[in-house]
């Protein structure tokens, strides 16, 4: 299919009249010049183990829910039981811990209200066996037929089952292509957490520090 001149002209007129679609504030002023919330975009979070990839993602998702009432659909097999994940979100929402070892922890009433809020804004899908990326996306779409969703998260992509006899490059290329098409169809925010490969974990700079990982 070739895009017609009329389609292009109408698009250009719309941009001239209404401007480009811009992101909205994260509620974190120092971050906004570099990153904002915008539907229809893919955000990939990567980094070495235990540096806070999931925590960073959850906090941003929580802020989007708190500011704009976003509803999220997640696949996060490394963060079970689900109750612990809801506690993390509730603590972020309140800005206080629920840990009984802290004297200034959140009150029980506020804690339970925050957990209820988290459950209303975050839905977690689980599978009995490790799914493929296509199976996860299909399950997301089935759920989205009955519930309006603003954002999606897969954490991590590496956990998903890869086809046999397919190179890692081809697998990730196809997976990201399918994710992009999903985003275009549904106009959602999409967070994708990716662990760096073994080779990236082994690399060191001349001073012995690890270089920043990439895809």
Where are these regions (language model features)?
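Phosphate-binding/switch loop-helix module in NTP-utilizing enzymes
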Residues: 123-185
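The Walker A/P-loop phosphate-binding site
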Residues: 2-96
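Cytosolic-facing regulatory segments adjacent to core modules
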Residues: 32, 67-148
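Switch/connector loops and helix/strand junctions flanking conserved nucleotide-binding motifs
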Residues: 81-86, 95, 161-164, 199-205
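Generic enzyme active-site microenvironment
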Residues: 76, 153, 193
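Conserved, well-folded catalytic cores of nucleic-acid-processing
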Residues: 64-67, 88, 92-96, 146, ...
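Phosphate-binding/switch region of NTP-binding enzymes
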Residues: 32-34, 174-215
């Amino acid at each position: 299919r070739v895009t017609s001149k009329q389609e292009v002209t109408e698009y250009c007129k719309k941009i001239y009249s209404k401007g480009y679609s811009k992101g909205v504030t994260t509620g974190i002023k120092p971050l906004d010049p570099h990153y904002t919330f915008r539907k229809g975009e893919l955000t990939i979070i990567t980094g070495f183990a235990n540096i806070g990839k999931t925590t960073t993602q959850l906090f941003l998702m929580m802020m989007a829910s708190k500011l704009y009432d976003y509803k999220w659909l997640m696949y996060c097999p490394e963060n079970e039981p689900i109750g612990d994940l809801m506690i993390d979100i509730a603590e972020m929402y309140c800005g206080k811990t629920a840990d009984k070892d802290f004297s200034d922890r959140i009150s029980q009433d506020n804690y339970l209200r925050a957990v209820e809020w988290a459950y209303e804004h975050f839905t977690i899908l689980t599978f009995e066996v490790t799914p493929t990326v296509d199976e996860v996306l299909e399950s997301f779409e089935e759920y989205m037929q009955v519930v309006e969703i603003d954002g999606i998260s897969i954490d991590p992509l590496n956990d998903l089952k890869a086809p046999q006899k397919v190179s890692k490059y081809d697998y990730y290329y196809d997976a990201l292509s399918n994710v992009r098409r999903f985003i275009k169809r549904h106009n959602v925010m999409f967070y994708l957490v990716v662990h760096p490969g073994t080779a990236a974990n082994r690399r060191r700079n001349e001073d012995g520090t690890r270089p920043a990982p990439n895809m």
